[in-house]
Amino acid sequence: NAVNIKPQIHENYDGQKIILDEKDNIVLDPTEFPDLLNLKGQTLITSDGHTLLGVDDKAGITGALAMLKYLTEHPEIEHGDVFVAFGPDEEIGCGGQYFDPADFPNVEFAYTLDNGRPGDFEYDTFNASEITIHIKGTVVHPGEAYGLMVNATTLMNDFLSNLPQDQVPEKSRNHDGYFLVLHAQSNVDHADISMIIRDFDQSEYNRKEQFIRDLVKKMNKKYGNRFTVNIREQYENIYNYIKDKPYIVNLALDAYRKSGLKPNVQSFRGGTDGNFISPKGIPTPNLFNGGGNYHGRYEYVTVEQIDKLAEVLTNIVTEHLRQTRTGRNEKPLEKYW
């Protein structure tokens, strides 16, 4: 949970185990989380092991504010207009729901600061849909059920067994998509299934949606119109809005290199607020916030990584002004997957 968070500061981290709570034997161990070994000598921040830390996205907020503070304290640094927005509901998929581009006049593009190590950069995310399926059974006394009862649980099991068993999260990686059954409950009278589909590729994503529609049609033909389905598209891959605007990507990568970072361009197996902001006319790829082990008791971040984020943001602002004057880096994007 996020109540009573008690941050712990570990200066000059030595790469060894960190006992978050000795009594409850809660330990942050680099043998379990080897990325910690890359943080030796840095100032590590953790929780006390009983809550999450909230790095996602307190680290991003801190980096953005540090950039604003730096620019404010150094008026000699030339830059254009800079807008910063904080969306409190990103983790429940509503962070960009009430984002109004009219509040950000003349903004050409933006960046989210959502997870990732320094150097990570993402402009390719999932397409996403959530699906609900309702199945209607017929209840009859079991002793008189022959030829009459239709058990919704049996129908549900038949539907689930027809889903692709090799296209699930635990068997997917890189640019693979998947089907995921989140919840299924049933009795004889009715059954309900909640699931999601994810895919980077638009055509594969469309095929997954159509597969569900066809499977429902098949089940209805087999059992007599007892299945209803509702498919709600949640968000679209931001690549669709960025692929023809290479400057947005190149500017960030130029700023990374200027900050001494080696860019690590990758696909993001999820979504960000950029998935909701990009369709509103402001293409928004994702940078990083520097944390690790998000959403759990073993979350961490370092002061140095947040500082690096602030440096990158400052360099994006100043580099944008420079390239606007001297010529933009419009090098075409290359597929990296």
Where are the regions a protein language model picked out?
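Active-site-adjacent substrate-binding region
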Residues: T154-K171, Y178-L180, R226-F227, E236-P285
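Phosphate/diphosphate-binding glycine-rich loops and adjacent basic-rich segments that engage nucleotide
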Residues: T112-A145, M149-T154
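Zn-dependent metallopeptidase/amidohydrolase metal-coordination segment
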Residues: N187-D189, K262-H320, N329
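Glycine/charged-rich beta-loop-alpha catalytic/anionic-binding loops adjacent to active sites
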Residues: L37-T51, K136-V140, S259, G291-H295
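Acidic-enriched catalytic cores of C-N bond-cleaving enzymes acting on peptides and small amides
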Residues: Y123, A145-A184, S203-T228
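Acidic/His- and Gly-rich active-site-bordering loop/insert found
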Residues: N1-I45
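Short, hydrophobic beta-strand segments
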Residues: I133-I135, A191-D199, I231-I238
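Acidic/histidine-rich catalytic neighborhood of metal-dependent amide-processing enzymes
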Residues: L37-F126, V168-S172, D176-Y178, L182, ...
